[in-house]
């Protein structure tokens, strides 16, 4: 039975109010959600509509370039605000969902910072979202603990700096409406965390720090900045207290990195190279280009032309503006009981971080506590006792728009690559429908970006004349359906237990990858099912 709570006028909540939820869903916290919704929802909707219009132009053949109207910002001599002390050193950042055990292990991992996630590594059902807020409130106060399977989990004296990723602009919180409209998932996550924790964090010498996902333009960054200004005033903390690192994980945002930093310059803590979603974004934005087709996902590394151009431009842009540049995810995880495979995987992490550190990045992401020492070692080799290398200006890097659009490699596309996309897509979606958004699959820690790349590549290969396997077979809807049947059986064997979500996942994956239309985000229709 739901615990009774007092709601602001015009607000309705359909999610169950479990015992303890009333400490998060307080009248004052919900009033902040309602106020921010009323102030900014029309702009959010206008920006989402602008995405639709831009997509139509891209579908008609338009290609992005650096904006003529913001040339003065790109050429100006401005900097972002000085960083707070506990965001100066971010050599290794660990990421993971807002789940209690994960939070404790990540904060204790030895990483400099921990991005705790309401977004891609979290299945956003109501319980996960509100339990996540409870967990973070306890973590901020250092009271978080857990007794599980005979083990006791507590925080160490020294913990990582906490950074919170709310949901992106495109996602709603379906359980909460204001004046009959669903509220933004991002504003809901952000406002509840800020209200309950901003002053406590400041008192402990830190602050409310965020990661902002999935933005496609500097106008979307401007909206976040305006939300920050209004929210800081509402909760009574100084302007500029909030800091936000923006994930550059859409190809359109890569053309507006200076402008995004400029919009958030009072509140910026740099940019991050969100590599997996970036690849998905490229496929999505140029899906109708018959000449555009990428090879197997495993071949699209950070060293291929368009990814290398994006990584170097991000680095150069950040350091020019005195902002940290954080490298992307190493999704590899330690492999038990296979020393040879484990050595190879750890070698991959090492070379990944070595390249980032040598290029000039100030830190990078890992998905597992076991990778923290390896990543740390590579950054310390380059940084020594310096907290970052923002002073390393990359004036030698000259990137033009065409470099960001140099989509290679186109081959090989293999049966193994196609089957892997189908297998991983079904496996991840099934876990997501079952409430888990962070899933180890084939020795990689996968989140929603993986499923997005998988299904969008399959969709593209079916439609592109270049979607031909290296053995000469054309990728067709029929071939995908045939492989999907077999891969569903493989997934069911590997997961055991309740396989019903995986049956549903296979149907969704097949429908999305073989249908004529392209679904913008698979999490949008899926969210209605959880």
Whereabouts are the PLM-identified features?
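Expand to "…catalyze enediolate/carbanion chemistry for C-C bond making/breaking, isomerization
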Residues: 2-530
